[in-house]
């Protein structure tokens, strides 16, 4: 017969192990969430967003797989530049994808210095989708400071002919953008529903999509408009920078 102490230790080990397995499963479910159903009739135009983390890509194959547009990471903060931007941009243009560049906004750096960092990467390039500023909550910055820096960066880009789209999730939208940046096209990350807002231009609905020509997972997005609205954008003159992409409702 096993000693009572050994039985208690074994029982505690089983309980702790079970709790640990449950915690890991719960955390995994929070991270790997089944994407919402995206009605292809309501959202017929799909695209991806990429960075150097996606590695080497065959964007011609991605285009044949139904991808029609791409957002490419260009820069972050005041001094980081994505090492693969130039190559990814070249591949996107060769594949015929409508292309935009995005900048990850750092709350602790000034708006002008971040705009300058971005422009050093994208200047002279044709960007049909224009520029997106990625606003994601991190740290605990003062809201008024964030808004001031965002406004400074946006105005700096606007004065140089660039129309800005904002990327964020619903929390970031409510905290920073909904009141102070009305009228700007929004690119919203949401994995829960398709309740598209009136100012949504793009909807990121999946972080784990599979696309031919890309190894591993890739972010998938939908244009928040009809096929006709999408096609009508490209009948306008494209100046090499951006113009409003939010579809008319």
Describe the residue ranges of each PLM region.
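Substrate-binding cleft of extracellular glycoside hydrolase catalytic domains
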Residues: 30-35, 40-63, 74-154, 158-163
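Hydrophobic membrane-insertion alpha-helices, especially the h-region
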Residues: 9-29
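Functionally critical loop-and-helix segments that line ligand-binding/catalytic clefts
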Residues: 35-55, 181-249
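Short beta-strand/turn micro-motifs composed of small residues
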Residues: 103, 168, 190
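Structural recognition of alpha->loop->beta junctions
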Residues: 119-133, 176-199
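N-terminal Lys/Arg-rich, disordered targeting/topogenic segments
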Residues: 1-7
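Aromatic-lined carbohydrate-recognition surfaces of secreted/lumenal glycan-active proteins
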Residues: 161-174
